[in-house]
UniProtKB/Swiss-Prot annotation:
CDD domains: F-box_AtFBW1-like. It comes from the Eukaryota. Changing residue 366 to K: In strain: cv. Mt-0. Changing residue 326 to I: In strain: cv. Bur-0 and cv. Wu-0. Pfam families: F-box, FBA_1. Residues 1-46 form the F-box domain. InterPro entries: A_thaliana_F-box, F-box-assoc_dom_typ1, F-box-assoc_interact_dom, F-box-like_dom_sf, F-box_dom. This is Putative F-box protein At1g12190.
Length: 375
């Protein structure tokens, strides 16, 4: 049987639609294919067409959940290799997407891992501080090529007048290009809400900056705080639409790739509100305007935190990964008043999850001792 050779343009169009995990294996087909799959233009076009995913972790397995939003929405559940070094217990690990990489940090550990699941690349990050907690990853938006930075904080006891002491929270950053950590701020605990209780487990990365929710000690309002990696400063970004006395801890997500969304679940009910920012998030924004996107009633497990994304290209849809009222993993797809629940089919009572856009963007190569592993 004669071998049929496809036109190169047609081959590119096909490869744009191949899942990232499969594409990474095609780099060994030929030098021409390897050049194409590493090309920045190809990576950008592929990312624009990739289907959204959730990542789920148990203590023994990792799953990807591909979501297809056609006329009859469905999901595809796939088990992935569990090849993240130093991530032992998902219950004490935070997973933060940033520019299509995943930042995996265990609580009060001096180790974290930057991971690209599609390329099966990992990079270990270490801190020499005791009682250290990683807060997230971002980059200097003013630099070409995205100079990634890692952010975290430590707690220590400081003696005062020789006989009393107080706890000090110290914030640090390090650049990917080096192993050197720099202290950027000292804060006395109880005197300032910088960081807040949600810095480590309710943050998002957008345009290189970190955003997270906290609450004002004075007004009981929920706030979004941010850290600008290019200027190395904290600031109060905005006040959220709901107060602490009416809703559980709000859940942030990225909307349209350049805006923020927030999910408020009302205490003691299944009722939720999803709000989105009207304008793009950038330095020119002086006042943040929030718009109601959707109200919905979804029964989820008590005190559980959902992961979600919004799709409004053609119709308003909310896609949420969570534990249902019985503690079982599921995905809800909501459109107008229609709500579809899809059980994920594995039976574990505890798991972690996050929304993630898979991509072929490689982890920046080492320059000073930080090693990249290709599993």
């Amino acid at each position: 049987m004669a071998c049929v050779k496809f036109p190169w343009e047609l081959m590119e169009e096909i490869l744009y639609r191949v899942p990232s995990l499969s594409l990474s294996r095609f780099k060994t087909v030929s030098k021409e294919w390897n050049t194409l799959l590493n090309d920045k233009t190809f990576i950008k076009k592929h990312l624009a067409l990739v289907r959204p995913q959730f990542r789920l972790w148990t203590n023994s397995k990792v799953y990807s959940v591909d979501v297809s939003l056609n006329d009859d929405p469905n999901i595809e559940l796939r088990e992935l290799p569990l090849d993240i070094p130093y991530v032992i217990d998902h219950r004490t690990t935070n997973f933060l997407p940033c520019n299509d990489l995943l930042f995996c940090a265990s609580w009060w550990s001096n180790k974290a891992v930057v991971w690209n699941p599609s390329l099966r690349q990992t990079r270990l990050i270490k801190s020499g501080e005791e009682h250290f907690r990683f807060g997230g990853i971002g980059y200097d938006s003013g630099r070409p090529g995205k100079g990634y930075h890692i952010f975290g904080h430590s707690h220590s006891r400081l003696s005062v007048n020789g006989n009393t002491s107080k706890f000090i929270k110290r914030f640090y950053i390090t650049k990917f290009e080096s192993n050197a950590w720099k202290c950027i701020d000292d804060v006395s605990l109880g005197e300032n809400s910088i960081g807040g209780d949600s810095l480590d487990n309710n943050n998002v990365s957008l345009n290189g900056n970190l955003y997270w929710t906290t609450n004002s000690y004075d007004t009981d309002e929920y706030l979004i705080q941010s850290f600008d990696f290019s200027k190395e400063i904290f600031k109060i970004f905005c006040v959220l639409p709901r107060k602490k006395d009416s809703s559980d801890i709000p859940v942030l997500s990225v909307f349209r790739g350049d805006r923020l969304s927030v999910l408020h679940k009302f205490k003691g009910t299944n009722n939720m509100e999803i709000w989105v920012t009207k304008n793009k998030i950038n330095e020119s924004v002086k006042a943040v305007v929030w718009m109601m996107f959707m109200t919905v009633s979804i029964p989820i497990y008590k005190d559980s935190k959902p992961s979600y994304f919004i799709n409004d290209i053609y119709e308003k849809r909310l896609v949420m990964c969570c534990s249902d009222e019985n503690g079982k993993a599921c995905v809800y797809i909501v459109k107008d008043q229609a709500r579809k629940k899809i059980q994920l089919g594995f039976h574990v009572s505890e798991f972690s999850h996050c929304f993630y856009d898979p991509s072929l963007i490689p982890i920046p190569s080492e320059t000073s001792g930080q090693k990249i592993s290709n599993s």
